[in-house]
Amino acid sequence: MTGTSTTATASAPVKAVRVRPAGYSVVKAGPRGRFLLHRRASVVAAGLVVLLAAVCVAYLCVGESFVAPGEVVKVILGQPSSAELVVGTLRLPRMVVGLLVGAAFGIAGALIQTVARNPLASPDIIGISQGASALTVGAMTFGITSYTVLPYLSVIGGIAAAALVYTFAWRGGLHATRFVLIGIGFAIALRSVTTLFLTKGDYLVAQQAQIWMTGSLNGRGWSEAAPIGWTLLILLPAIVWAARAQRTVTMDDDTATALGVRLGRVRLGLVALGVVLASVATGTAGPVDFVALLAPQIARRMTRTAQIPLLSSALLGAVIVVLGDLLARKLFSPTELPVGVLTAAVGAPYLIWLIIRGHRDRSGGTA
């Protein structure tokens, strides 16, 4: 009896136990679909949506002339309003461009920092934005000044720069420090090329290019919003894939190989997506410095997740650009500063802090 009972027990099917990571909730999507949702990241994203909405309302209301929130709502809903010219023609399209540019920079920075595993691996530090700028400024000096064409030229320049950095940094693998240092070297070289174009071009065109290089939303309208808007819409499935693929990038090569994950292709796909987004954003508003550096790191600290959350990073990027442009318009009124000046003033000290902290971590806490 005992032997029979033991055999029956041993042959009984064993149910698989699913372990849910701490801090996550299971959300049902249809009869069969389920996915994990990080609770803190969801709360942070909801809070950022509210903050972004408040910033957008302030952006549309505040300017040389104040517009009541009720009039802003009328314009957005398409109802007759005396503020149609100020809000609908001037402020709203400029704000939409800022939202799209900030979101693109935020996602691009998150993807590239994830692959490089280095908070300094921002598109505007490792040469991607400089490559986009060099080709764009070169095109402007030859008479191509249409903002509907420049974003696509920026993509070509950004991809070319990223390919060079990736090729020179690859030595049987992608080492984070080597990737960043080679990127900084290319950024310096490409900035010199851009300066050469400025000195050889027509004075008026060079002046226009110089303003563009500081990162500005001045004069941006619906025609500038269309290219980057369509790009984000077309790349939305790739962005959703990237949000899931981020987890595999944090694996070591042996673990990824054992699980059948082609880690090299995943990394290349994430970098390519980040390069395209950063380049299109650069072509639309110029190199708005440090947005791609700030947004992902702040998002990660707010959510406390292992990976940089793309949604929170995109929302923070949009908040930084739109709020920065609002402050740039009002702080020194009637003089209007480019938004890139304000983001650089905030981002540069943060970059210095990151470098100092990294040095202290490597030296065991000693200066």
Task: Describe the role of every protein-language-model region.
Residues 2-367:
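Alpha-helical transmembrane segments in inner-membrane proteins
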